[in-house]
Amino acid sequence: MRSTTRSIAACWLAGVSLAGAAGPEDARAPLPPASVACLRCHPSAAGVLSGPMATRAAEKGFARRAFGAEGDRFFAQSCTGCHVAGCDDCHGARPHAGRRPGNDACTRCHRGYFVGWDYLGRAPREDHARYQRGAVADGEPFLKMLPDLHAERGMTCADCHTMRSLQEGRRAAKTCAECHPAVSRDVPEHAFAAHLEKMTCEACHAAWAPQEYGTFLVNAESAEQQEAFSPLRAWGPWRKSAYLRQQDAPPLGLDEKGQVAPIRPQFVLFATDPSRRWENRLLVAEWKAFSPHTIRRGTVTCSECHDSPRRFLLEPEAERLYELEKDGLPLRSFWSRDQQTVTNGSFLPEDRHEAMNRKTPEYVRQHLRQWQRLLDRAAPRSGR
């Protein structure tokens, strides 16, 4: 795939969704001759070549929501590559060699803030040049994190994201339950029907996820400004940085099916541009329900959800650590729902949050069972 530092960074900002149809104005460029030849024998592949990875409809939509009438110009200046242009992008120049694309074909684009890198235990580093060090993959330094259990067992991206599922516009070929049908109710967390029926598996089993709170774009005009911001990543005329990055269990909300699922900023975008008289202007404050590829057998304890209003963007003001308004930002808190929205779902209704925090006798019993299981595992074992 075509990729430059500028285009990779901008794609990372503009979207990670595999959902969304392209409108007439988002028609892709003509296919390369080699891909036209492929389609003669593989006509179903047209679903990929006309899908979101090729049309970039989600990225264009984000740019238009953030920049309004100037959205298309932002997209044209800053997001010019790292999308499927033809069959060779994933299958290489020898598609009949009998080898399906490996993880490296996916992570050329699904890296950084994209879901994909996290599967292999990689998280994006801070944007400043001083942090661009350490291990490198796909030409970019990364933080070493805990990989997904499935990756440790040798599974590749293509084991779940098959060619047919991509052709049909589906995110995956199988659900978790199709591979793991026998869920033990003896596990305390599984004893509650609501946990199995109203939550995605990732809500509990995703160990961590990259999160960026406050994405900043600066349009440096003068030579002095350009020098000052030169250590930051360049996106066309912009330089990019972040207020805060975290790699822990992500917040929770509701996905498009109404299930409790991980959510994260995508993005809370501020822009400074002297030519427009913008200073930390809030362009958009969007969150997205997503599927962290960081699955582990264990989960957080009960109190990490049931006694954590911040995780549901209901942070009490008395517990607030970051005073954004004192920093000159037009937003009360990243963990307050004011001025923010979930583009493919919603925040958990406050009455449901209140109900889930009632300490019923069954909740107390299962909470004690959970702690007892943890203590039993930690206890010394004889004969080992």
Q: For each of these PLM feature ranges, what is it?
A:
Residues 13-18:
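Hydrophobic core
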Residues 108:
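Acidic, glycine-rich low-complexity segments
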